[in-house]
Regions:
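Catalytic nucleophile-loop/oxyanion-hole region of alpha/beta-hydrolase
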Residues: 159-168, 174, 179-218, 237, ...
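Primarily recognizes the serine-hydrolase "nucleophile elbow" in alpha/beta-hydrolase
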Residues: 42, 200-263
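Hydrolase active-site cap/lid region
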Residues: 88, 92-103, 232-287
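Short beta-strand element of the alpha/beta-hydrolase
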Residues: 143-154
Length: 380
């Protein structure tokens, strides 16, 4: 138990350890209760404590502390998070609820399951269609609901539109239409195929806005990991005033930087992923690396952006989001960067965990802010 708890403190060195680290960091508070129960059982035995029992108590105490540490860090961040977000997005955008709820940690919310409509978006190359799952907004406004375009992760060579679908249901229940799109995958399809499919998905949604009940002038691109790279790469292109904002969780935004700073033999073979996605190393496919790196596309007209990243992410270095946040600040682009020191890649697998709650609070604030009012057309 203590070894498992240590994953809340250390960077996970292997894929299995990474998956266990998600459980330790975002569900560990449940196991901390188990540690407390075991301590009670040891003490209830009575008699002399002895070195063996003392060692067991120490280990259980350490385990409980480590397992509670993410929740403690989240609580500390939650105390200042509303004010941080108000400073960027305004008073009216921040929810009145607490950024972190103890009740939600131990009694997760039930997700209201909504109908899902699957549609087909024709590929740019005319060689078939790609499925799109659409979640209609609950009680959407008469003029059409804002639409969140959900772009899945998976290292550009895997994943699909059904990833973490509970988030789509929750957003739709809050009054946002959600479109979980598909895109062609590497290595069969290299850049810019995936980006073209994102653009095609948005075009489809805009052309069918009336029947879908969405506002064609209020889109938000939301991607996790590889999907976050696509969200910023596509969302930061000029001439798209209908893109009100971009959300990226634990994503790489500068693939030149990723190539230079990826260790050999890491938890993820990022060199292989980039080669098959972009067509080679940077010296072989420099244009693709440039086009796919939103970091180099930032201007004062870049859409408002929300970035979320875990400090213990062993798959995508948190410096990717940190650097993009600094770049956005240099150009005066409204943005927020939520850093979660304990969190690993895909921490939001548990939307009611310490990281999931803080990210959800920041997301709700962001969506309220960027879908209100009117964004002026970009002129870059």
């Amino acid at each position: 138990l203590t070894g498992f708890a240590a994953l809340t403190w250390a960077h996970p060195p292997t894929p299995p350890a990474w998956k266990l680290a998600i459980l330790a960091g975002e569900y560990g508070h449940f196991l901390a209760l188990l540690s407390g129960l075991l301590v009670s059982l040891v003490l209830a035995q009575g008699g002399a404590l002895g070195w063996n029992r003392f060692a067991v108590l120490v280990l259980l105490g350490v385990a409980a502390g480590l397992l509670l540490w993410p929740a403690v860090q989240a609580w500390r961040i939650s105390r200042g998070l509303p004010d941080r977000l108000r400073a960027v997005w305004g008073v009216g955008a921040v929810p009145s609820r607490a950024a972190l709820s103890l009740g939600r940690l131990f009694l997760p919310r039930l997700t209201r399951r909504l109908p899902v409509e699957t549609r087909e978006v024709l590929r740019v190359d005319g060689a078939g269609g790609l499925p799109l799952d659409f979640y209609r907004a609950v009680d959407g406004p008469r003029g059409g609901a804002p639409c969140v375009v959900m772009i899945h992760g998976g290292g550009w060579d895997g994943g699909d539109r059904t990833q973490l679908a509970d988030a789509n249901h929750r957003l739709a229940a809050r009054g946002y239409a959600v479109a979980a799109i598909s895109y062609r995958l590497a290595p069969q399809h290299r850049w810019p195929a995936a980006a073209e499919d994102v653009v095609a998905g948005i075009a489809y949604l805009r052309s069918h806005a009336a029947e879908l009940g969405i506002d064609p002038e209020r889109f938000i691109l939301f991607g996790r990991s590889a999907g976050g790279q696509l969200a910023t790469a596509v969302g930061y292109r000029p001439g798209q005033p209908f893109i009100r904002g971009v959300v990226a969780y634990y994503a790489p935004h500068d693939l030149h930087f990723a190539w230079r700073n990826t260790p050999e033999g890491g938890i993820l073979d990022f060199f292989k992923l980039m080669r098959q996605y972009l067509g080679g190393a940077p010296e072989e496919a420099s244009r693709a690396y440039d086009e796919a790196s939103a970091y180099h596309a930032v201007t004062p007209q870049t859409p408002p952006t929300l970035l979320v990243h875990g400090g213990k992410d062993s798959l995508v270095w948190f410096r990717q989001s940190e650097r993009l946040a600094a770049r956005l600040a240099e150009h005066g682009v409204p943005h927020a960067y939520l850093a979660l020191p304990w969190a690993v890649h895909a921490f939001d697998f548990n939307p009611d965990g310490p990281g999931g709650q803080l990210a959800d609070f920041a997301l709700e604030t962001f969506l309220t802010a960027v879908t209100s009012g009117r964004r002026e057309p970009a002129s870059r």
